[in-house]
UniProtKB/Swiss-Prot annotation:
Record keywords: DNA damage, DNA recombination, DNA repair, Metal-binding, Zinc, Zinc-finger
GO MF: DNA binding; zinc ion binding
Single biological process term from Gene Ontology: DNA repair
DNA repair found in the keyword field: yes
Source organism of the structure: Corynebacterium glutamicum (strain R)
Name of the featured protein: Recombination protein RecR
InterPro entries, A to Z: DNA_Rcmb_RecR, Hlx-hairpin-Hlx_DNA-bd_motif, Rcmb_RecR, Rcmb_RecR_Znf, TOPRIM_dom, TOPRIM_RecR
Domain Toprim: 79-195
Zinc finger (C4-type): 56-71
Length: 218
């Protein structure tokens, strides 16, 4: 154990995902030896994330504006919505060049062990985008007033692109049941070939591109 600010820094770095005590210690000692201007830039970047990043009021993606660039792009196909767990998943799909529709970010996946249920995810806003009504009263009660908006009547298909693990599959199954209440809406899931038990961000672009183009209706 070190003392003072150094140990405080190590402790805070250790709280980051994927950073263990040894990695945190290496990062901390690296920061001790970098130019002060680099530290200043890091501080400014951290402050910018805290103060300059918000979530799109339509799709819940990370955005600098009230509406993100994808939702604002009239060239995107508003009739197809790809549902993902996290904003980082959008970047993975965009790199394939296979999808030209719009997205909806759930903000996670169903996980009863972590007390994450439908009310903790951005499901109610997804249902409103599609049909403007909430068939599940519990979801309706959980919708913040400032997130209400008109439905997009042109939505033809919803692609469920949650992670191919236990939580992601449970989330896709739950959404599939909910979305069956909307007439004339096609609900599809990424095709087989995705590695089971993994995260979408680690799937290579070719595999993901094939999974998108060969998606299966559910």
């Amino acid at each position: 154990m070190f003392e003072g600010p150094l140990q405080d820094l190590i402790d805070e770095l250790s709280r980051l995902p994927g950073v263990g005590p040894k990695s945190a210690q290496r990062i901390a000692f690296h920061l001790l030896n970098v130019d002060p201007t680099d530290i200043t830039r890091l501080q400014e970047a951290l402050g910018g994330v805290r103060d300059g990043v918000q979530f799109c009021r339509i799709c819940c993606n990370i955005s600098r504006e009230e509406v993100c660039r994808i939702c604002s792009d009239s060239g995107r196909d508003g009739g197809t919505i790809c549902v993902v767990e996290e904003p980082k998943d959008i970047q993975v799909i965009e790199r394939t060049g296979e999808f030209s529709g719009r997205y909806h970010v759930l903000g996670g996946a169903l996980d009863p062990l972590a007390n994450i249920g439908p009310r903790e995810l951005n499901i109610s806003t997804l249902l409103q985008r599609i049909g403007g009504v909430l068939p599940d009263r519990e979801l309706a009660d959980s919708t913040p007033e400032n997130k209400l908006f008109d439905a997009t009547p042109t939505v033809r298909e919803v692609i469920l692109a949650t992670d191919p693990n236990t939580e992601g599959e449970a989330t896709a199954s739950y959404l599939g049941r909910l979305l069956k209440d909307f007439p004339d809406l096609v609900v599809s899931r990424l095709a087989s070939g995705m590695p089971l038990g993994g995260d979408l961000e680690f799937v290579d672009e070719l595999t993901l591109s094939r999974a998108l183009s060969g998606r299966l209706q559910i």
